[in-house]
Structure formats: C-alpha cells, structure tokens
Amino acid sequence: MSVKVMTHDNMFVGMKEVDHYLAPSDYEDESESELFYESYYSDDIFEDNESDLWVDHEDDPWIEQLDDPVKTPKIIKPYPWMTSPTKSVDKAAQKEKKMPDWWTKPTTVTPTRNEQGILNYSLLLPPSTKKPTQPNKRRKNGGAKPPNSKPLGNPAKPNGVSQQQQGPKRDSTQQPTRLCKSVLKQAKCYFGAQCGYAHRYSDLKECSYGKNCKKIVLVRVNQDGTLHLANKPGAVCNFKHTNEAQQSYLARLPQSTASPKNPRKK
C-alpha cells in the first residue's frame, strides 16, 4: 500500500507525482521502511478493540431503544406520629389575615411595665396570696400580757447619786467573785453598770460554808475586829468570808492587774 501525495514540486514543477513514503531515494533498505511503519503503526493500538474490529454485528438481534420513562412527582405523606391529624374545612376555617406593618402594630409594652428601660416581669405574675399563719405551739396560752404600767420616758434620778456610783443590783447567785481592775489600778471603768466584776469589796460574794469552810485557816484577829485568813496547803477558797479583811483577801487571792499578752503579737 502506498500513499501518493502532491508535493511542492507537483504544484510548481511540471506537476510531478512522487510516492513520498515509498520513494527509493528516501530509504536505503527495506528494513528501514519496515521499522518506520512498525514504530508508527504498532499492534498495541488495536489490542483493546480487536474483538470489535473482526466481529460482524449484522446478525445481532435488534434491540429496540425505549424512550425515557415519564417521571411522576413524589407525594410526601405526613407521618401520624410526627404531625397532627388533618382538619376539615369546617373546623379550621381559613381567614384572610393581613399582617400589620411596623407602623400599625400596637405597642405591647405598657408604660407601667417599663421601669427605667427594664421590663418589670413581676406584673405578669398572678397576685400573691397570704399564707395563713399557724400559732406557735411552744408558746403557752396563758392569756394576754398585762398592760405595761410603767410610765414612758426616763425616770427621775435620785438627788446627787448616779447609776454608776450606786452600782448594779444583782441577786446573791449573780454576785461577782473578783474585783475589777479599775479598783486595783484606781482608774475609770468604761463598762460602768454592765461590768461583770465588783467595784467595791462589799459587793463580792461570800462563801456559803462560812466558818465551816475546810480550805482556810484563821491566822489572827486584827484590832478592828476583822479576820486575817490564809489558805490551807493544796487548797484555795475563791470566795470572801465574813469579817475577812480586804488585805487578807488580796493576799490570799492575788488579783491580776495586767491584761494577758497576745502570743501572736511580737
């Protein structure tokens, strides 16, 4: 098989026909021409479609090409567990409602609810009801309290005697057993009548055993008739005894005149 082409010489030089691919002047040997065809027309090109090239399809049965099926729209049905049942026209009558514009909408916030730019939601709650108060079971029902017969206002003070100088009035069970530091230091007590210590020696509580107390020993009797007592070894009586001298009481029970130091402060 040879291919004849029209070269440049054919057009302008006597219309000379040249067998371009099989011209003897182009290839010295036939082996070169065979190599040329093998390189450009190899069998690898026809490997994939070799079966189609050499098979005659004239005897194959006729397959009718059908048109594309008509697509019908899919109807989505609501699930009974997911949506509410449909309502009839009578039960759910549709009314044409025109949505109001922003300039025709009524104000939903009343001026009473708006307090300094903050909505007062407590006005929307139901009114509070007062709970019935139950009587106190611990309190005894002994009747009403008697009216206070004391006159209002400050009572009249005695002539020239203040409450601090007079001293607090205590029962025998509430009498102090120690002297105040202001008496020992000869200073002013800032607590006044509310002080829990005695401001006078006569205000101290006496021993309930008296002469039968087994923790003291009589040392001597002073010229003024007062007694000078002392504690027995291994025993201390913290109370004042009758006719005991003040010096005897202070010697037997030394009073602390200094406040205890705070160990944290240096």
Curated annotation (Swiss-Prot):
- The segments labelled Disordered in the record are 84-176
What are the boundaries of the C3H1-type zinc fingers?
A: 180-192
Q: Name one GO molecular function term.
A: zinc ion binding
Q: Where is the composition biased (Basic and acidic residues)?
A: 88-100
- Record Pfam families: Zn_finger_prot
Sorted UniProt keywords: Metal-binding, Zinc, Zinc-finger
Question: What residue spans carry the Polar residues bias annotation?
Answer: 105-119, 160-176
* Family designation: Belongs to the IIV-6 077L family.
Query: This chain belongs to which protein, by name?
Result: Putative zinc finger protein 034R
